[in-house]
Amino acid sequence: MKRSDLLERMLNWKCECDILVIGGGATGLGAAVDAASRGYRVILLEQHDFAKGTSCRSTKLVHGGVRYLAQGDVSMVVEALHERGRMRLNAPHLVKDMRFIIGNYRWWEKPFYAIGLTCYDLLAGRKALGRSLPMLKRSVLKEIPSLKHEGLRGGVVYHDGQFDDSRMAITLALTAIDKGGVCLNYIKVDC
């Protein structure tokens, strides 16, 4: 849909809407999709490109919450894995597998990571992106030759998700428009 069509849709509503979203970042776009999919007349206005601010400064990871596992927050891990699975289901073209290698330098790190990441894989179940595995020192150095050699004992590989945040933003805007909403950028709102 062209910008002129969106402006016309907005004018046909006589600039009245049920919900006005100011800001086209991830949160604003998500709110616009949710509102439009529920049948609300929603207008989203963004003063720059969609997802130009904080949303474009993300890690680009759709992580399953592995860091929460180290803190013992299992419920947060389960929630993060559930959300990652939902995102892979709803937008498989935007989420891809990303391998991470963690070098082990202390004797206790190999069993620590092996146990933790095995739990992570079990919690992920069918939503797992790949299996966590221990690595020999030579395998770690073959994949990451610039890693500090001294004291390296081996490593572990695990999988998490990565996504393209700008493609996600455009996909959300187009989905909101598809559902009957209006999303316009380069419109500044002065209150």
Predicted segments — roles?
Residues 1-19, 34-38:
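Extreme N-terminal leader/targeting segments of oxidoreductases
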Residues 28-29:
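N-terminal Rossmann-fold NAD(P) dinucleotide-binding loop
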Residues 32, 36-37, 175-177:
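Gly/Ala-rich phosphate-binding loop of Rossmann-like dinucleotide-binding domains
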Residues 36-56:
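Glycine-rich FAD pyrophosphate-binding loop
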Residues 59-143:
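Dinucleotide-binding Rossmann-like beta1-alpha1 core, especially the glycine-rich loop
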Residues 156-191:
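Helical element adjacent to the flavin cofactor pocket in flavoenzyme catalytic cores
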